């Protein structure tokens, strides 16, 4: 599949995996929407939607930075409409935005619990919902969720139940929408790269050895 001229709508695209997906697509001449909350520099995490847009264009693509909170339905609707107005369509929806807290049940603050479910599950569902009518107009449409394989082994739930529950809602969106949308020729897939453990957001919530800790606690795609 050639990405030249294709429009990617990427949530959480200001840094990390989302930005890397955008940059790789840009090398093939894609048009990349960077839809994320970070418009101003974060004290601990590098990158904004505007610096990300510069990187996309440097890689050879076209960029459209949009401030987006995936929890806000009006914001999501308007972001999709802005994309259509600017680029004329959407070919690929990448649900990358996610919240993480690798904490036990007693140590999980309910505000953090709610945030993870609002962003991971509801946000993925909401963004997909508004992209689908436009994906139906594409001749090679895809939805890609940054989500793990559904593995019901207790070991994936025990250490950080709230996060696993929230993240698996994204995985269930893959299974459900793949079945729902197959008659519309919209492919729906999940991507769970091992490199996800090296993103700055993950490093904020793990110590003293974030890479090793997450590698031992995340389900693999094998």
Please identify what each model-predicted range represents.
Residues 205-210:
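Conserved small/polar residues in nucleotide/adenosyl-binding loops
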Residues 6, 61-62, 89-90, 135-149, ...:
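Active-site loop of short-chain dehydrogenase/reductase
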């Amino acid at each position: 599949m050639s990405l030249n001229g294709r429009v990617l709508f990427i949530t959480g695209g200001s840094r990390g995996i989302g930005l890397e997906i955008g940059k790789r697509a840009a090398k093939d001449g894609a048009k990349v929407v960077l839809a994320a909350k970070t418009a101003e520099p974060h004290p601990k995490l590098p990158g904004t939607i505007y610096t990300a847009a510069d990187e996309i264009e440097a890689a050879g693509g076209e960029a459209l930075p949009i401030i987006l909170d995936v929890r806000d339905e009006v914001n999501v609707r308007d972001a999709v409409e802005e994309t259509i107005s600017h680029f004329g369509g959407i070919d690929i929806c990448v649900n990358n935005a996610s919240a993480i807290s690798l904490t036990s049940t007693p140590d999980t603050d309910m505000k953090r619990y709610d945030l993870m479910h609002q962003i991971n599950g509801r946000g993925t569902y909401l963004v997909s919902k508004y992209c689908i009518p436009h994906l139906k107009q594409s001749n090679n449409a895809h939805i890609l969720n940054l989500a793990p394989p559904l593995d019901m082994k207790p070991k994936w739930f025990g250490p950080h139940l709230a996060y696993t529950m929230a993240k698996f809602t994204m995985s269930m969106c893959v299974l459900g929408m793949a079945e729902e949308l197959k008659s519309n020729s919209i492919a729906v897939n999940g991507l769970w790269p091992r490199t996800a453990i090296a993103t700055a957001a993950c490093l904020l919530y793990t110590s003293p050895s974030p890479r090793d800790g997450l590698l031992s606690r995340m389900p693999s795609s094998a």
